[in-house]
Amino acid sequence: MSRYQATNEPTERERAKAERREALLREATRLFALHGYAGVSLEDLGAACGISGPAVYRHFAGKQAVLIALLVDMSKDIYDGGLKATEDGGEPMEVLARLVDFHTDFSLSRPDILQVQDRDLKSLPKSELQLVRKLQNAYIGLWTAQLAKLHPEATAPSHRFRAHAVFGLLNSTAHSAHSPRTKKSGMKALLTQMALAALATPVG
């Protein structure tokens, strides 16, 4: 190992700090989903991670900074995942199938963060809200580009409406997945089948 590589490895203290930050983000996601952003204090967040409320300031400037990190990072993750799903190209339905696969996996594995976005997005400052909206629009564009190829006779607003309808279907699991009566086994297959049918249905 070179001297350069050695000096760029994180120290034990840096690793511990990074782990604490990730723990705070995980607990914030859970607490915001359960109680809403307004219903959670820094003291609540710190207690969930075994630290005091003021100790949270070592990692974030405040509660709003936690929300910013959660929702901006989530929007980047979704866009990056969608971009990766389209990289190999192919027929429109093939690309859309990969997008559906990615989005369904995301909604089933991270229902809490989707619930936080749905309820607390408007609590972001204006600049961060604009960034999230920009990333969301870019992600929608990945879908509508394929829908335009699949349904060339339809209008751009129609493609956007269809994409949003599918998002509504897939994101609904962010709420139903919390129910103890809901079995995730078989849920992905059913959601995928329904989403693909909605995307493929010819324009009336």
Question: Model-derived features: where do they sit?
Answer:
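N-terminal intrinsically disordered/low-complexity leader segments
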Residues: M1-E19, V203-G204
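Amphipathic alpha-helical segments that line or abut small-molecule/effector binding pockets
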Residues: R26, M93-L108, R160, H164, ...
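Short, structured motif recognition centered on aromatic/hydrophobic residues
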Residues: F32, I78-Y79, L96-V100, V116-Q117, ...
